[in-house]
């Protein structure tokens, strides 16, 4: 009896260990933790002041297929920072803005948050610029590619057979964390009041990002960003067949 009990306990422990250890999860935890521990962004590339007064530049993304990548960011801080009692503050609260499918880093979105007293950084997470390639194209193909862009989204997690470091969602979350690091490197930002906002696929990225980067003070995922496999539409149909999801 004692041998049987011991065997059952051993099997239980092994099963628990197997459930807890997942190479994919281990890779994500390690990669994101290293980036978060830096707590500062890498250098900016191709910094320029836009005609609308905003700053535009590129930040380092994660390597893609063994090649360095960079992603577009548009940033500006408010003229009058907001704090909770409505008075003027020395440091501004800030927010990372993540677009949805077919979008990009939008300067107008940055301005709206500036008007509310927030510094804001909008990022492009599919290797694109904010320059229109063709008015006749729709979605992601509407925008010109950047020179060092990373992967594009492939359907609804259709790239799950790739190595984790080459999956689009890994790169998108990496970019969001890097944007947080950038904000934390700015002296005029209140590091205790930095949040993240995402719309649609940006909401999915937002919800995923806050599972790894606990430095964010708030997160606002806007519509269509959770329990996708339970939705009776193309998302549910696709994800129910996806073993990794």
Predicted regions and their residues:
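Boundary at the C-terminal end of the N-terminal hydrophobic targeting segment
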Residues: 16-18
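N-terminal cap/lid segment of alpha/beta-hydrolase-fold proteins
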Residues: 35-90
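Bacterial N-terminal signal peptides that target proteins for export
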Residues: 1-5
